[in-house]
Amino acid sequence: MLIRLLLALVFVIITVKPLAKVPNVLFVISDDQSYPHASAYGCRGINTPGFDRIAKNGVLFNNAISGSPGCSPSRASVLTGRYHWMIEHAGTHASTFNNKYFTFPDLLEKSGYWVGYTGKGWGPG
């Protein structure tokens, strides 16, 4: 009996995959915020210590463009990785976002990440 128990234990130890350590992903976007208006970019009139800490330990974009002059189409472009003119009504201020377009949060969730948001997930406006 003890041998069977030990064999079962060895089998379980061998077949169990170690949990893969996946990186945390934090994506933050703000509407209608001009490029230099955060202290991480050197703005002296606006104090943004939370963003500064994230920028120091993560990624700070210094050369990026908006996919569209409107906020909802820009968010839709960022979320899908497509130009706003390629995603039908999601590329406008219309209130529909067709489910046929996958977003990177959808893909992260399917990969086992916990995904959440506050504020606007997409739009409109």
Question: Which residues make up each language-model segment?
Answer:
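Formylglycine-dependent sulfatase
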Residues: 2-5, 16-125
